[in-house]
């Protein structure tokens, strides 16, 4: 069985950057955001169900999902968000577990933004949190998502607080610094954790 490190953090924390650095070291990465896109690909049964529920306006001209339109609908309405989560989360979980079952690497990274909120910590042997201040979250996500500040604040409110997330952490990467300046230090931190996780994985797999 593969040793599982759960990687999580709030919106704008830099989870994807950290996951990419692990991937560069040859670590297998199972990313919930990637899986979430796969399960609603154009022509999929789930996408058809979503379009039937919310209307054709959540589709782009080519028939694929308009993620921005869908996000705006669900984050403005708690009941709609719950409906979507009840549809998607089981499908995403099933697909991630399917990918995990075929892993043969010493350890893999389980990248899940809502790892704590969706009670997926039990699937992990260790939890790594990418931590930034709320101000950094807002600034980064606002730059990335073209000034959708109200939407970003809604997303942050739907996630556990920074303090709550850190309670679950076995390891923490502080990612508040500007990435361009901090990349060498970030790479070193990831490399150090990689060696640590290989040691833990060896012990885990000997049991």
Swiss-Prot record:
InterPro entries with a match to the protein in the record: Depp_CoAkinase, P-loop_NTPase
Keywords: ATP-binding, Coenzyme A biosynthesis, Cytoplasm, Kinase, Nucleotide-binding, Transferase
Major localization listed first in the record, in broad terms: cytoplasm
UniProt record, GO biological process: coenzyme A biosynthetic process
Cellular component annotations (GO), alphabetically ordered: cytoplasm
Pathway: Cofactor biosynthesis; coenzyme A biosynthesis; CoA from (R)-pantothenate: step 5/5
Subcellular location, record wording: Cytoplasm
Origin: domain of life: Bacteria
Residues binding ATP: 12-17
EC number(s) given by UniProt: 2.7.1.24
Signal peptide stretch: none
Homology family: Belongs to the CoaE family.
UniProt name for this protein: Dephospho-CoA kinase
Species assigned in the record: Aggregatibacter actinomycetemcomitans (Actinobacillus actinomycetemcomitans)
Encoding gene (name): coaE
């Amino acid at each position: 069985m593969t040793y599982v490190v759960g990687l999580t953090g709030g919106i704008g924390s830099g989870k994807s950057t950290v996951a990419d650095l692990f991937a560069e070291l040859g670590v297998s990465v199972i990313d919930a955001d990637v899986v979430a896109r796969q399960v609603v690909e154009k022509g999929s049964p789930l996408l058809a169900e979503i379009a039937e529920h919310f209307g054709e306006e959540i589709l782009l001209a080519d028939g694929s999902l308009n993620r921005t339109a869908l996000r705006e609908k669900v984050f403005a309405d708690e009941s709609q968000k719950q409906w979507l989560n009840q549809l998607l989360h089981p499908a995403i979980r099933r697909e991630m577990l399917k990918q995990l079952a075929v892993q043969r690497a010493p350890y893999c990274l389980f990248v899940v933004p809502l790892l704590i909120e969706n009670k997926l910590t039990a699937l992990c042997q260790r939890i790594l949190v990418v931590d930034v201040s709320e101000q950094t979250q807002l600034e980064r996500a606002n730059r990335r998502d073209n000034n959708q500040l109200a939407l970003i604040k809604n997303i942050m409110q739907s996630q556990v607080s920074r303090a709550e997330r850190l309670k679950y952490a076995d390891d923490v990467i502080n990612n508040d610094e500007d990435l361009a300046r901090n990349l060498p230090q970030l790479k070193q931190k990831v490399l150090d954790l990689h060696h640590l996780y290989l040691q833990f994985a060896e012990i885990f797999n000997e049991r």
